[in-house]
A protein has these predicted regions:
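A cross-family "folded-core" feature that marks the main globular domain of proteins
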Residues: 2-150
């Protein structure tokens, strides 16, 4: 895989073996690397294949600390397994971005109201139960305590 752009020390945008743009994460993956160089495959922790606009998706991922990205993805995948659903990369990126922003809001002392929570609980009780379990797991592993309604 050839690097197209280094976003930070842990995130690179690449062209993979079959010509698709992909986003790779891993500790030190982009450290002292440049566009045109090959990727050290031993450093790859995750690979995301965006449906479209790989550049903007890569920037979202690059803006999230690697430890937080890994934690949120692990907790989300566990919840998806319990629910018995597949997890496309685009969904993972959306959830990771949402949870990261929620953590930043909490850190800044901002509180959000979720007026559709009761409706979501009624229409999707199992998904809501798993989301609440995700919040509990994230709270146990992070310094930021997300509100139950998140």
């Amino acid at each position: 895989m050839v690097i197209l752009r280094v976003l930070n020390n842990n995130v690179v945008l690449v062209r993979d073996e079959i010509g698709r743009e992909a986003i790779l994460t891993g500790r030190g993956l982009g450290f002292q690397r440049r566009a045109g160089q090959d990727v050290d495959a031993s450093l790859i922790a995750r690979r995301y294949i965006p449906v479209d606009n790989a550049e903007s998706v890569a920037e979202v991922i690059a803006g999230i600390p690697l430890e937080r990205l890994t934690l949120i993805e692990r907790v989300f995948r566990r919840a998806a397994r319990e629910l018995g659903t597949g997890v496309p990369s685009s969904t993972i990126v959306a959830v990771v971005d949402h949870v990261n922003q929620a953590m930043e809001r909490v850190r800044q002392g901002l509180v959000m109201d979720y007026p559709l929570r009761a409706e979501a609980a009624h229409l999707h009780p199992e998904e809501l139960r798993l989301a609440e379990a995700m919040v509990e797991q994230l709270n146990a592993a992070q310094e930021v305590q997300l509100p139950a309604g998140e």
